[in-house]
Amino acid sequence: MAQDVCPTRSEPSLSFLQGLILGQLSVVLLIAAFIKFFIFGEAPSAEETASIRATERRSRTLAHKKSLLSLRSAATQRQGSQPPALPALNKKKSSILRSNPPTLTIGSILDKTYYKVDSHQPESLDWFNVLIAQTIAQFRSDAQHDDAILTSLSKTLNGTSRPDFVDEIRVSELSLGEDFPIFSNCRIIPVDEDGLQFGAGKAFDPKQAAREGARLQARMDVDLSDMITLAVETKLLLNFPKRLSAVLPVALAVSVVRFSGTLSISFNPSNPSENTPTKMTFTFLDDYRLDFSIRSLLGSRSRLQDVPKIAQLVESRLHRWFDERCVEPRFQEIELPSMWPRKKNTRGGDEIIANIEQSINKAHGGAIAKEARQELDTETDGLRYRRRPVGDDTYSVSGSMPGSLPGIDMPT
């Protein structure tokens, strides 16, 4: 009898309503934690961030140099195991020029210019700073009177890479700064074809720099403390659940407040056999420091101002953009024009005198034309006042005509 009784079913400890409330609270807590720690979390200090980035760049540079050295050693072993190549046929050269000119190596260039790599003191580059300052000042002056840079920025920001959910980007502020970069501590360093210094930490050996691809590299410190600002405004088009259901205004201002680093410049001479022109390459070493000041504003009514996470994302993106273009081992290469003197590039001398005479003749001709116009206007005014009257009084004469008989009036 006791076995036929159904066991009582245990009721759940939490009702459906309690579970729903608990789930909603957990979602709210997760959203609050995300907003507090991810969006409004305090950003690390600038010194800490710069130290972390410098360590990452240094490790990347060391790994690149290590891979270059390993590839170079493997290539040397491979060349040693191969039989010697047959001598190439010499092309016929002009007999007018000297047949065997002395080969200019890095060692001979340094000797003839009296530059001792191991003992020469770094140069201050004051004259170079003045030239660069004049160039930048002229560029800023041209930008104030011309909208070319603003038009170019607008086209670049609104190019094909702009996402669909981002509205048209408008430049709201552009400041090119007021100060100038200061270059100093310039020194000449011989490097190999891969940009590695010969015998780093050791005395310079001219025999090592005699191989093909070696070149001289100028390294100089550069420091800039300024406020170069670019501010943009746009809207985020939130197309969910339907198109243009919500719009979020966004304003962002990025300012470069300081840059310091080491600039490396070198020349790659032309190769007539391969028809390659002379090129100048420049890059920055991995010990640079680049500081930004980033301001942000989200929303139209309930505005979120200066969100730290947005500043971190933008700054990280800008550092990555700079590293991928002109920080070693990457470099920028600029093709240089021919330095041979040409008639079409000649300025000064008789040409300046001819231009001055032409401008004087134009000014003199303009003055003569102005005087002629004034004389013509004066004659026109005189003719206007000597015009005969019109109407009934055309031939009326008051009194007697000279030479007429007294008492006889002329008929009218």
UniProtKB/Swiss-Prot annotation:
Gene Ontology process terms (BP): lipid transport; mitochondrial genome maintenance; protein insertion into mitochondrial outer membrane
Lumenal side stretches: 1-19
One MF term in the entry's GO annotations: lipid binding
Keyword Ubl conjugation: no
The SMP-LTD domain, residue ranges: 121-337
Keyword Membrane among record annotations: yes
GO terms under cellular component: endoplasmic reticulum membrane; ERMES complex
Domain of life according to the entry: Eukaryota
Assigned keywords, A-Z: Endoplasmic reticulum, Lipid transport, Lipid-binding, Membrane, Transmembrane, Transmembrane helix, Transport
Its job: Component of the ERMES/MDM complex, which serves as a molecular tether to connect the endoplasmic reticulum (ER) and mitochondria. Components of this complex are involved in the control of mitochondrial shape and protein biogenesis, and function in nonvesicular lipid trafficking between the ER and mitochondria. The MDM12-MMM1 subcomplex functions in the major beta-barrel assembly pathway that is responsible for biogenesis of all outer membrane beta-barrel proteins, and acts in a late step after the SAM complex.
Subunit structure as annotated in this protein's UniProt entry: Homodimer. Component of the ER-mitochondria encounter structure (ERMES) or MDM complex, composed of MMM1, MDM10, MDM12 and MDM34. A MMM1 homodimer associates with one molecule of MDM12 on each side in a pairwise head-to-tail manner, and the SMP-LTD domains of MMM1 and MDM12 generate a continuous hydrophobic tunnel for phospholipid trafficking.
Domain notes: The SMP-LTD domain is a barrel-like domain that can bind various types of glycerophospholipids in its interior and mediate their transfer between two adjacent bilayers.
PANTHER family reported in the protein's UniProt record: TEX2 PROTEIN-RELATED
Name the UniProt record assigns to this protein: Maintenance of mitochondrial morphology protein 1
